[in-house]
Amino acid sequence: RWPSREEVEEALKAWLSRHPIPGLLAAGYFGSYARGEAGVGSDLDLLLLVAHSPLPPWKRPLGLSLEELPVPAEALVYTLEEWKGLPQRSPRLARVLREETRWLLPPP
């Protein structure tokens, strides 16, 4: 049996409490789990907003222990400045994230 959205959300909350992320401002998830469409093989798409980061966006998730979550997971990690500029840089992605994201820790 594949984990339900409720099980995954509880595991994500516990994971966030065990792994403090420096400068974390907001945390949520989007995609099939957020839409309530997850099934066997679905992964968890995380969205994390941080105050700032010296790393490029593609390197930021590398230090996260995502393998501890009950389903495969990927993360987008944006600085607040990048998040605010996302609608201009990538309007479609910004719209999807705005409409789908279930926030556990809402953005400021």
Outline where the language-model segments fall.
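Catalytic core of pol beta-like nucleotidyltransferases
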Residues: 1-28, 34-41, 50-108
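Short beta-strand->loop micro-motif that forms the acidic, two-metal-ion catalytic signature
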Residues: 46-48
